[in-house]
């Protein structure tokens, strides 16, 4: 690599880091390499090229143009190649050959039911979903050869449906003739019942057992003893696909071993491949998700607003998406272009039906009243000393700051001696649990609240 090429690539990395979320930078950019620049074209190597190329084309084209003009005073375009061309070509050739063999059969085309907006490129990755993302990409790259079935489980609103659709969309991009179907378990049940009534079970079997990729969402819906032959039909469908090395991906709200009403033979098969868990996103991932989601809205979201929202919704992505819709309504009503913390807080209050907050309570006032009650100073509450009485006062003050103000977790942490948001969240959860079990502490906190109000 020449000196100017190195300068160009360093500038591409620098601009990328400043313009996309940290999780996206780590996943899509960090492993990329500049191979050469030839005829004003930057040759960039990527792993998982079919998925990552799309992200680069959609998000980083302007970065390459900017770096090109800065370093070479010329318009530089990009050509993306796999960092393991031989492996990619062999894998794709084998998959294409296999798919062509299947598609020589006189099987009717089907609607995949996929939502094209869900891709790997716009899925925000964090520690809580990293294994699920990696496994999903591996399955999409080589359907039927690894992790079959792939079983993704976790609570609602954590991205399971997004990953199912991303897998299906990538497989269809790689091979448009592949027979891919996304369906919820509930709709599978409905189709089964409908075909029973119409005496057309052969049509159902043809539809499901000739797929290349079956994506079943919320498989726990199948775990009902009252459904008669539904589990039997799904068992036979599973066996037919698995025997022919066709990929199956399932999602559930619980571990396969906890699907108590499913037949044991089905549960056993769900564990043949790879069960992976997705847990609620941490604060940093929620910030990254919001940074990604707000691109869909025509407003300016300052960083403190993003952090405030990330602190308010800590269970799942669906809540964050719902909050953004509420904020959009409030912003339109106010003709606002910038979403301040006040606008966000008003929208959240409306969403939660909490009504207006009459008084804005300073965190310092909470610290003063808590300190007076427990006989410690505000300085001690903010410091690092960890005697039992000071720790309790500090955690109660953090709890009340979270309960009685609209401040984000990072803002509260800053007011307590620059503590991390996770420390505030730990204190809040600890006191919340203690209040539920300790009537004396509950009375103490109500007494302090009355002094603050």
Curated annotation (Swiss-Prot):
SUPFAM superfamilies documented for this protein: P-loop containing nucleoside triphosphate hydrolases (SSF52540), TrpR-like (SSF48295)
InterPro entries: AAA+_ATPase (IPR003593), Chromosome_initiator_DnaA (IPR001957), Chromosome_initiator_DnaA-like (IPR020591), Chromosome_initiator_DnaA_CS (IPR018312), DnaA_C (IPR013159), DnaA_dom (IPR013317), P-loop_NTPase (IPR027417), Trp_repressor/repl_initiator (IPR010921)
Gene Ontology biological process terms from the UniProt entry: DNA replication initiation; regulation of DNA replication
Coiled coil regions in record: none
UniProt entry keywords in alphabetical sequence: ATP-binding, Cytoplasm, DNA replication, DNA-binding, Lipid-binding, Nucleotide-binding
Keyword DNA-binding in annotation: yes
Family as reported in the entry's similarity comment: Belongs to the DnaA family.
Protein name: Chromosomal replication initiator protein DnaA
Organism: Streptococcus agalactiae serotype V (strain ATCC BAA-611 / 2603 V/R)
């Amino acid at each position: 690599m020449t000196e100017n090429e190195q300068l160009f690539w360093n500038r591409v990395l620098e601009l990328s880091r400043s313009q996309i979320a940290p999780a996206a930078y780590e996943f899509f950019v960090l492993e990329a390499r500049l191979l050469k620049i030839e005829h004003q074209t930057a040759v960039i190597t990527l792993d998982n090229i079919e998925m990552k190329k799309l992200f680069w084309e959609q998000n980083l084209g302007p970065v390459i143009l900017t770096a090109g003009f800065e370093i070479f005073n010329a318009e530089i375009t990009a050509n993306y190649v796999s960092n393991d061309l031989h492996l990619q070509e062999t894998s794709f050739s084998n998959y294409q050959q296999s798919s062509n063999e299947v598609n020589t059969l006189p099987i009717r085309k089907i609607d995949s039911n996929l939502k094209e907006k869900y891709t790997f490129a716009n899925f925000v990755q964090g520690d809580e979903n990293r294994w699920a993302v990696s496994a999903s990409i591996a399955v999409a790259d080589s359907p039927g050869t690894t992790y079959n079935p792939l079983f993704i489980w976790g609570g609602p609103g954590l991205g399971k449906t997004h990953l199912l659709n991303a897998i299906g969309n990538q497989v269809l991009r790689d091979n448009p003739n592949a027979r891919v179907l996304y369906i919820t378990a509930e709709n599978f049940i409905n189709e089964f019942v409908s075909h029973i009534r119409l005496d057309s079970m052969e049509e159902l079997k043809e539809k499901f057992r000739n797929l290349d990729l079956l994506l079943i969402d919320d498989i726990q819906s199948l775990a009902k003893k009252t459904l008669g032959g539904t589990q039997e039909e799904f068992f036979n469908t599973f066996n037919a696909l698995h025997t022919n090395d066709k990929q199956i991906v399932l999602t559930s709200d619980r571990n396969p071993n906890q699907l108590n009403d499913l037949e044991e033979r089905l549960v056993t098969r769900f564990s043949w491949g790879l069960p992976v868990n997705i847990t609620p996103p941490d604060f940093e991932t929620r910030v990254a998700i919001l940074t990604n989601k707000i691109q869909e809205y025509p407003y300016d979201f300052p960083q403190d607003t993003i952090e405030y929202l990330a602190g308010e919704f800590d269970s799942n992505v669906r809540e964050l998406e719902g909050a953004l819709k509420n904020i959009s309504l409030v912003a339109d009503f106010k003709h606002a272009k910038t979403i301040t913390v006040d606008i966000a807080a008003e929208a959240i209050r409306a969403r939660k039906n909490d009504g207006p907050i009459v008084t804005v309570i300073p965190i310092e006032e909470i610290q003063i009243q808590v300190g007076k009650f427990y006989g410690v100073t505000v300085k001690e509450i903010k410091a690092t000393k960890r005697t039992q009485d000071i720790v309790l006062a500090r955690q109660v003050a953090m709890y009340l700051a979270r309960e009685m103000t609209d401040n984000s977790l990072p803002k509260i942490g800053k007011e307590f001696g620059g503590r991390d948001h996770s420390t505030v969240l730990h204190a809040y959860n600890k006191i919340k649990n203690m209040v539920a079990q300790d009537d004396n502490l509950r009375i103490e906190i109500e007494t302090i609240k009355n002094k603050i109000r």
